[in-house]
Amino acid sequence: MKYILPVLLFPMKRILLFLLLLGIFKASIAQISSDSLEYRIRPDSLKTGELQLSFQNFNFMRNYEYFNKIQDGYTLFGTQLEPQLVYFAHPRLVITTGLHLQKDFGATGIYRTLPLVSLKYKNGNTTLINGVLEGNIHHRMAEPLFDFEKRITEPVEYGTQFMIENKSLFLDAFINWKRMIYKPSPVQEQILGGLSVDYKLIKNSSVQLSIPLQLTAFHQGGQIDIAPEPLQTLVNTAIGFKLKIPLSGFVNSLRTENYLMGFNDFSFTDVQAFSKGHGWYLNTGFDTHFGSLMGTYWKGMSFISSNGMPLYQGVSQHIEHAGFTEKNRKLLMLRYSYQKQLIPNLFLDFRFEPFMDMGRPAGNRKIEFSNSSFLVYRQSFKLLKPRVDR
């Protein structure tokens, strides 16, 4: 299809290697900003030799009042705790080790416990990470490609990540090894490669303009499994532009973020309902001291995303309607968000996102919505100072 962005037809492992070697773009923040939810630990030449205790507590409530056939209605309510030991081994190297724990309210015991181990090397504007990635929301991908909810449901990603960060350029290229297998495995391995890019063309006091480029490549297969399912290789792409106009007064800024998205199934065997598709993801809104308001329009045609929010897709993940297809999706959303630092190290993030399915007959259209609140506390404590040789 002429609207689909071209994707190199390399074997999957070459695609993933290609993502790591790319170094010419920058990641983008799509739709609602999640800056207050990001947490990055990096090497620091002023802390060389120090041992710190890093503490992050992420409290979440995300509720979906959905009554459609594509995405379920449900509530995620709980807390995550991540204590980590952070050793600044060298001006360019930091090593971290710790635990991720998740407690879901209303459930018995700890829902999930995962190890956190990472090595981060930073040289100038480039960073190489191995182990636990700066994942999910840190990739800054648009929701149709990468579901925001994965901050809760898949909070820890393991693999390798390469980043470039400067005033006009930020690149996030990563391999997330989702499932490892051992011979003979009853299930297939799963790998997700990604590239999230945003190149700033103009940035001054009167206007900011940038070009985002995003790509995910999901592979499920392997050569040492005995699973009967055929291998799958699904690729999603996005390209667009972001424009922000700073203002003074009640409205701080006007902004628009718009994307053309593509889907291609490069599997040898047809498993998905559609082999290719595309979608338009259009966002326009404004920011004030009392929060941000944004209108969103989505038009998807045969669109599937391996990691995106189910609502935007043409194939249902609903518990009662799994496999139901809706080739053409038209959604109209109004999205309010409010982020604030309450006290040092404590951040609040609130979101209210009603939408209407414009693909339904006029008399059957209903307003559905999701609402979210996040309370995040993060702090670092010095445990060991660097030894000074006399």
Model-based region annotation:
Residues 139-144, 270-275, 285, 289-355:
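Outer membrane beta-barrel transmembrane domains
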Residues 51-57, 97, 128-130, 162, ...:
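Membrane-embedded beta-strand positions of outer-membrane beta-barrel proteins
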Residues 127-198:
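Surface-exposed coil loops of outer-membrane beta-barrel proteins
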Residues 32-50, 90-92, 125, 200-212, ...:
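Short loop/turn motifs that connect adjacent beta-strands in outer-membrane beta-barrel proteins
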